[in-house]
Regions:
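Amphipathic alpha-helical interface elements that mediate macromolecular binding in regulatory proteins
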Residues: 13, 17-21, 75, 79, ...
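Conserved active-site-adjacent core of cysteine acyl-enzyme catalytic domains
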Residues: 50-132, 145
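Conserved beta-strand elements of beta-rich interaction domains across eukaryotes
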Residues: 12, 20-22, 95, 125-127, ...
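Noncatalytic regulatory segments and standalone regulatory/sensor domains
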Residues: 149-194
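Canonical SH2 domain fold
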Residues: 129-145, 150-155
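Active-site nucleophile-adjacent alpha helix/oxyanion-hole segment immediately C-terminal to the catalytic cysteine
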Residues: 1-68, 76, 80
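Beta-strand elements of modular eukaryotic interaction domains
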Residues: 4-6, 106-112, 129-133, 140-141, ...
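Short amphipathic alpha-helical interaction elements and helix-loop-helix interfaces
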Residues: 21, 25-30, 43, 47, ...
Length: 194
């Protein structure tokens, strides 16, 4: 475990909140913030649907049906990143035709100080319920130390866990994409779109 590293533990389905706080190493994101962002996204989409003559949405797809429970959509997390002047600079996902593409893409990954890379967010399948009819997803952060050693900072774990060097990071990301249908989001400073 990494001494002095900020680490939030899982509460309800707030893994997106914990991931943001673990990524930025401070407790700035809250369930109230994420609820507000989810409502704003819902209102924007409802207005666009109304303008285009599409039917009304009755349920907010950006969060849990139950208020304050969490289970926030990736779009809520992406909007929250903007509040910290950050964006996703790379998004990688498993491709069965190229099973090692994610690992290969990250083999020469450079996240040394000065590159603007804050860390990585993983969104992976967490549970498959009802015989695979329903799956839930879980977010967690991966952050570099000042010595370019990478750590998993997952709210479901008792504390931060070391991954190792960039080559070990590439293997970890490839495994997450391959085995857990993980989406890999590289978070960088500044504005931009993937």
């Amino acid at each position: 475990m990494a001494d002095g590293m900020y680490h939030e533990k899982q509460y309800l389905m707030h893994c997106a909140v914990h991931t943001l706080n673990n990524l930025f190493q401070e407790p700035w994101a809250t369930a109230a913030l994420m609820e507000d962002i989810a409502k704003e996204l819902f209102d924007r989409e409802a207005a666009m649907r109304e303008e285009s003559g599409m039917g009304r949405m009755w349920v907010n797809p950006y969060k849990s049906l139950v208020p304050q429970v969490g289970y926030y959509d990736i779009n809520v997390l992406l909007e929250a990143l903007k509040l910290k002047a950050c964006h996703v600079s790379l998004h990688a996902v498993f491709n069965p035709k190229e099973p090692h593409a994610v690992s290969t893409a990250f083999e020469g990954f450079n996240a040394k100080p000065g590159t603007g890379v804050r860390g990585i967010v993983i969104n992976r399948v967490s549970k498959s319920l009802l015989g695979g009819l329903y799956t839930s997803h879980h977010f967690y952060a991966i952050i570099p130390s000042t010595k370019t050693i990478w750590y998993v900072v997952d709210s479901k774990n008792p504390g931060p866990e070391i991954i190792g060097t960039t080559s070990e990071l590439a293997l970890h990301l490839g495994m997450e994409a391959r085995e857990n249908q993980g989406h890999v989001f590289v978070v960088s400073d500044g504005e931009g779109d993937v």
